């Protein structure tokens, strides 16, 4: 996603490029320190039981404004790739959404414990990255 954005002239700051844990607060603070215009956090969802749920969901502080528009655009693109669109939902209690000084979106790209989502994720990875990047580009 980042390289696609950079190819389109967007300056990208990564809070994490290795598999070393950083707390949500640390990530939010890094975004604030670099003065980012937007904060996008990309994750895989999980459920209590395997194959219980399927789809993409984006989380925002509230459903109004720039973050919500970006979340809707990202979800629409991921739906075109083949994910079930579970919608844009408010989660004002999440640190990366309530501690950033800029519009923030947390994207849950399918369920990591759902076979269908994993198959889609693996087989269409580049299209997924493009859909997320396009959703961001449409919103900035």
Which ranges hold each PLM region?
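Active-site-proximal helix/loop segments of hydrolytic enzymes
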Residues: 1-140
């Amino acid at each position: 996603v980042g390289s696609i954005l950079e190819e389109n002239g967007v300056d990208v700051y990564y809070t994490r490029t290795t598999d070393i844990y950083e707390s949500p607060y640390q990530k939010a603070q890094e975004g604030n320190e670099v003065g980012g215009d937007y904060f996008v956090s990309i994750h895989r969802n999980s459920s209590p039981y395997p194959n219980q749920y399927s789809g993409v969901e984006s989380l925002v502080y509230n459903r109004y404004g720039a973050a919500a528009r970006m979340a809707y655009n990202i979800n629409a693109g991921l739906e075109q790739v083949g994910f079930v669109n579970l919608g844009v939902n408010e989660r004002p209690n999440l640190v990366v959404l309530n501690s950033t000084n800029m519009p923030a979106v947390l994207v849950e790209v399918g369920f990591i414990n759902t076979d269908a989502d994993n198959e889609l994720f693996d087989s269409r990875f580049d299209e997924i990255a493009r859909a997320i990047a396009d959703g961001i580009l449409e919103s900035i």
